[in-house]
Amino acid sequence: MNTLKKYRKLYDLNLSYQRTSNAVATERTYNPTTGGYVTHPVNVNGNWRTDGTFSTNGQFGTNKAFDWSSHSSFSYDHNVDMANVVGSTTHELSTIGSLYLRERLSVNYSQRGWHLGAKVQGSYNRMTGRRSDFKEISAWDYSYGLTARL
């Protein structure tokens, strides 16, 4: 009886969370008498980050000539800092959220020392903030291609 499997699969999952307490920010206050700014360090809380990845890959087909892989990842940053709003003489807390998503896929065929493959990857970034003068950012990026080794 032949017990050799015709395919192989691997999985990998990673998750993490980091939090910063008492981060040092620079507070800047406008002095209308002198026309300058007074700066000094202050502690802020609320900075944290979470991220993760999930990867899987495998082989299939006769002599495991085909292989495929998928790699997904995300991260979210919650950043708190001090900010000056244009026209204001005081400062305020500024909170920015940054989301990053990414996916990468590939399929390959190998036989007798030569190799053909296809790959595609894409990412999405989004930054949001609650300040009235903050402009939200949403951006997509993608790439694709073929590979060969003869």
Go through the PLM ranges and name each one:
Residues 1-150:
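Exposed, low-structure sequence patches enriched in small/polar residues
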